[in-house]
């Protein structure tokens, strides 16, 4: 599932999370603010021509037939999504006071994974009904899902930085989950009262367990944007001796400068869904948004925000066309539960890594070390670049203290350095 904040800058398929093959739409999304209307208008039909020049064919977008706003990369993805869960979760024909809409507003305010849990519940209902329906079939599917590591959400979730898991935190978390579960139950019950009754037989307990399962097992999805390579190839194909081609290149340069400014102003935790010490410190994608967004949300001095945006504009003005063409475009960021990865154990020196090649959320595991028959495949649950203390702190959330060979070696190194400083 694509993170809700990421939808502000990337148009991705609601089912497979691949980029929508429409240059005009991708530009409309990233330049969605009214201030960019003149920029898009000045481009005219260039985005469509760039689309065709890349061999993509005319831009086309497949939308939900019921008008909810969901978009897809193909009719096949749209139809499959509708059959799996969207038939029960589409808000297109609903009134503003419908519990499903209220649930989605609640989820957008508090946690994206509430939306993913709703997809799981709708999927279970559809599977149960396809298998004949009834409470027993539903309960069997529930047990099948809980074969993965799980716990109530209040135990599995990570509190914000500086916040302790105290009575106030537990009360807030339980209230959030209970309200979401009540709204979702009210939304789904008219469609399948027997199956929904089984899902909520213990109140919000199963809903909370599913959310906890996501906390322990979900991995971050990242699908690279095709926009950068598309425009780079187009720029290389233009002849600088041709006046029309030169004019097109100048318009492309103006677009790229605005994109770089947007990346510096609106790219960060909100649009990636990666918070706190999960952020890769070596990431090439700018993180200036975090400070500016926090300043705006907290009502801090508007001059601070204005100055930061002006600084970003000045930085972009110094970039050459070659640098602009090499610049990063927003990736699709999301979260997902993958059964194969959810069954893998942790190692701080893993022998496989997870990647998402191509334009979709299809997962591939690739070996990073030599693997012999009988070896266990392990991934790293946390950032491999983090130091041993940070890794261990994060791994405590999974319920264990790591004592692998790498951790022990780094412990010894840290101890020797500390002893040397004391001498």
Stretches with model-predicted labels:
Residues 1-423:
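Short alpha-helical interaction motifs and adjacent low-complexity tails used for partner binding
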């Amino acid at each position: 599932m694509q993170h809700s904040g990421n939808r502000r800058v990337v148009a991705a398929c609601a089912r497979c999370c691949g980029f929508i093959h429409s240059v005009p739409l991708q530009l409309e999304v990233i330049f969605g603010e009214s201030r960019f209307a003149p920029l898009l208008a000045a481009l005219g039909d260039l985005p469509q021509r760039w689309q065709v020049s890349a061999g993509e064919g005319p831009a086309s977008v497949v939308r939900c037939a019921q008008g909810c706003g969901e978009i897809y990369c193909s009719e096949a993805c749209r139809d499959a999504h509708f059959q799996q869960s969207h038939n029960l979760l589409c808000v297109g024909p609903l009134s503003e006071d419908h519990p499903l809409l209220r649930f989605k507003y609640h989820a957008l305010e508090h946690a994206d994974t509430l939306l993913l849990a709703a997809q799981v519940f709708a999927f279970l209902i559809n599977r149960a009904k396809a298998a004949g329906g009834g409470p027993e079939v539903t309960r069997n599917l529930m047990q099948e899902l809980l074969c993965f590591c799980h716990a109530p959400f209040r135990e599995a979730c990570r509190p914000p930085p500086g916040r302790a898991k105290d009575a106030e935190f537990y009360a807030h978390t339980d209230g959030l989950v209970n309200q979401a579960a009540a709204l979702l139950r009210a939304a789904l019950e008219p469609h399948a009262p027997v199956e929904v009754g089984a899902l909520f037989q213990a109140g919000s307990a199963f809903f909370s367990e599913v959310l906890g399962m996501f906390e322990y097992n979900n991995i971050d999805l990242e699908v690279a944007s095709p926009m950068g390579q598309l425009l780079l190839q187009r720029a290389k194909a233009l002849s600088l001796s041709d006046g029309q081609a030169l004019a097109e290149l100048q318009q492309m340069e103006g677009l790229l400068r605005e994109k770089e400014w947007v990346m510096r102003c609106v790219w960060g935790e909100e649009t990636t869904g990666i918070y706190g010490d999960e952020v890769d410190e070596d990431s090439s994608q700018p993180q200036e948004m975090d400070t500016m967004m926090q300043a705006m949300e907290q009502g801090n001095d508007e001059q601070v925000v204005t100055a930061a945006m002006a600084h970003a504009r000045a930085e972009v003005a110094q970039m050459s066309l070659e640098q602009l063409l090499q610049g990063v475009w927003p990736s699709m960021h999301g979260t997902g539960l993958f059964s194969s990865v959810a069954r893998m154990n942790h190692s701080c020196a893993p022998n496989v890594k997870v990647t998402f090649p191509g334009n979709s959320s299809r997962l591939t595991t690739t070996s990073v070390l030599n693997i012999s028959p009988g070896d266990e495949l392990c991934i790293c649950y946390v950032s491999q670049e983090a130091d041993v203390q940070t890794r261990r702190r994060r791994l405590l959330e999974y319920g264990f203290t790591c004592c692998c060979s790498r951790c022990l070696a780094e412990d010894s190194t840290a101890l020797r350095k500390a002893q040397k400083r004391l001498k």
